[in-house]
Amino acid sequence: IRTGLIGFLTALIAVLLIVFFRKRAIALMVILAMVLLWWGRFPAGDWDLFICDVGQGDGYVINLHDHRAIVIDVGPDPGLIDQCLRRLRVTTISLLILTHPHADHVAGISGARKGRRVEAEWIGNIAAGSTATIGEYSIKVLWPLQVGAIDENPNNVSIAAVIKSRDLTLFAAGDVEPAVQEKLRGQIGRVDIYKVAHHGSRFQDLTLMRELAPTLALVSVGEGNSYGHPAQST
């Protein structure tokens, strides 16, 4: 997700070239276009949220600038998450949130740590009511209810949190199932972005989804996965 700063700067530079160089403007604009095409292969510095291609799993990166980021889950493949973070030029993970101990969310951990400093890590050591402020983002944990929570279904001990900045509100809930989603009703309100629980499976609490009323709903899945994610009903 980007803000379009590159497009604005491109137009501004083009106008300045025409005004000040005239005859050389066309040649210079061609060179500029080639540079921008090359530059465009890499994420702009003004992006807020990036979804890593980790296959059937989750891997989300929130930009803190200066090569720092918040990372939510790391997918199943160390190589894929490492490749993504290198592409984004992330050298410091200010907060690594591993929502729950399933391979499609945590097995890539060695790749995320490779050559990077991890300043704080949440997995099973955080509970509802906990808060943090990292850069311009505030984070409020809504689930699980206690540290070290245990459930016969590990999905239901996923870390669920609201992450806010001045311009963005994101709700991410790992793989929590409807029984937990119901308990989160009335605690969140409207959000800009909802990281849909459990890869958009058919097990969703529609009342919560209506309360969230997200502008953008994100689902991370592997192409042709055997789980039927995302469900058509979702």
Where does each model-flagged region fall?
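Non-globular, low-confidence helical/coil segments that flank catalytic cores
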Residues: I1-T234
